[in-house]
Amino acid sequence: MAKEDTIKIEGSVEELLPNMHFRVSLQNGLNVIAHLCGKMRMKNIRVLVGDVVTVEMSPYDLSKARIIFRQR
């Protein structure tokens, strides 16, 4: 899958789950399970409940996502 095929959408973190996973509520009303991307883990960027984040999703599985940016 090419990087251009991904879907980027904003949402807010609703719940912290074990093992660096988060329940994110998207703008369109869907809830997805998301994990941090590798660069955010390396830079120790903290994500808390209520943070607005940008997630990247595959068009093949719309129930999982990757957090790629945390709004300031």
UniProtKB/Swiss-Prot annotation:
Residues 1-72 form the S1-like domain. GO terms for molecular function: ribosome binding; rRNA binding; translation initiation factor activity. It comes from the Bacteria. It is found in: Cytoplasm. The gene is infA. Keywords: Cytoplasm, Initiation factor, Protein biosynthesis, RNA-binding, rRNA-binding. This is Translation initiation factor IF-1. The keyword DNA repair does not apply. It comes from Protochlamydia amoebophila (strain UWE25). One of the essential components for the initiation of protein synthesis. Stabilizes the binding of IF-2 and IF-3 on the 30S subunit to which N-formylmethionyl-tRNA(fMet) subsequently binds. Helps modulate mRNA selection, yielding the 30S pre-initiation complex (PIC). Upon addition of the 50S ribosomal subunit IF-1, IF-2 and IF-3 are released leaving the mature 70S translation initiation complex. Coiled coil: none annotated. Component of the 30S ribosomal translation pre-initiation complex which assembles on the 30S ribosome in the order IF-2 and IF-3, IF-1 and N-formylmethionyl-tRNA(fMet); mRNA recruitment can occur at any time during PIC assembly. Belongs to the IF-1 family. One of its GO terms (cellular component) is cytosol. The keyword Disulfide bond does not apply.
